[in-house]
Amino acid sequence: MSMGILDELDWRGLIAQSTDRETLANDLANGPMTVYSGFDPTAPSLHAGHLVPLLTLRRFQRAGHRPIVLAGGATGMIGDPRDTGERTLNTADTVADWAGRIRGQLERFVEFDDTPTGAIVENNLNWTGRLSAIEFLRDLGKYFSVNVMLDRETVRRRLEGDGISYTEFSYMLLQANDFVELHQRYGCALQIGGSDQWGNIVAGARLVRQKLGATVHAMTTPLVTDSEGKKFGKSTGGGNLWLDPEMTSPYAWYQYFVNTADADVIGYLRWFTFLSADEIAELEDATQNRAHERAAQKRLARELTTLVHGEGATTAVELASQALFGRAELADLDESTLGAALREASNGQVAELKPGGPDSIVDLLVETGLAASKGAARRNVAEGGVYVNNIRIESDEWIPQHSDFLHERWLVLRRGKRHIAGVERVGA
């Protein structure tokens, strides 16, 4: 079973680096291993980029090992050095609030029970918050060579630019100490993180060996980019794709993955789903021979939306996708799903219809950007290509009535088969 997890991670392409592979394999084979990954609360929510380490923890649990998900309530107040410069320090209350929210998200990805593989959630503020300056310098700092710390690539680049604060420079020590604490408390023997964390993770394994005389392991997963080299998990507007449905709607989340390029979708299925090799091979064949069906993309979107938001949200999103384009009933959508779907389908540009404002179909087509001019709008109507709530509009003098508004608030405008826009009635 334990050797199987490394084999599975290999074929899925999920191992970027690791400490001695043979020793790790032997230790995994000798019984359940406790494995951890840490997540700093640098925002109110985790984002899609966190999925790889999160799902890797889940894979270890399914293979018979015990996962620890660590919320960085302390390290989140410091900030891991990054290339773009010094981080803005958030208040302790803000970080605590974010850590609480993130903890709830972390708990969705692993199983909690009373078995030897039942997951644990920790917060490094529990031990770092009690660490005095003297203890930090004597019990941690003594084990770290400044020469080695300066050799870290991110630190080097920062020193070549505007420099780096001692606060961020010391981050490595605090993360390394997390490994010591988790080993002492739970026997944790493996830390997992993104490949940009390799230096910090190895430093932790080294500190465990130096302070406790124990051998522990380090493993990193690849940083995910698409076939064009762009960072994974960025929305159309360039922002993060958040796991919090209030920050990224389930509809927007689903649409991101259903629009995955053919060149990326099979890799994403390996990294982000628990589908078997045979199932993925079938979807790969479908992509190569029947790409127009987009079977792999639809399966990817369904798996990940269900994983993050639940089966009910996935069903609602798929119904919304069909309804917007005339393949299902708009009236069956709840208001929140309809509103989110409209905003996403129209790139966030939902026109407002105020009392007494221009409200003919011609005005609405121009206002929403579905027509460049009133003349173009009239031609679109005359050609039979304009729909409101999936009903074809026959006259360019059409004006919406109260009964036309879905949930007494929304109109769904469509030009042709693909161009969607929303109208929201306000102040009525």
From Swiss-Prot:
Coiled coil: none annotated. GO terms for molecular function: ATP binding; RNA binding; tyrosine-tRNA ligase activity. Its main location: cytoplasm. The keyword Zinc does not apply. GO terms for biological process: tyrosyl-tRNA aminoacylation. ATP binds at K234. A motif ('KMSKS' region) lies at residues 231-235. Keywords: Aminoacyl-tRNA synthetase, ATP-binding, Cytoplasm, Ligase, Nucleotide-binding, Protein biosynthesis, RNA-binding. L-tyrosine binds at Y36, Y171, Q175. It comes from the Bacteria. Residues 359-416 form the S4 RNA-binding domain. It catalyses: tRNA(Tyr) + L-tyrosine + ATP = L-tyrosyl-tRNA(Tyr) + AMP + diphosphate + H(+). Pfam families: SYY_C-terminal, tRNA-synt_1b. HAMAP family: Tyr_tRNA_synth_type1. Homodimer. Catalyzes the attachment of tyrosine to tRNA(Tyr) in a two-step reaction: tyrosine is first activated by ATP to form Tyr-AMP and then transferred to the acceptor end of tRNA(Tyr). This is Tyrosine--tRNA ligase. The gene is tyrS.
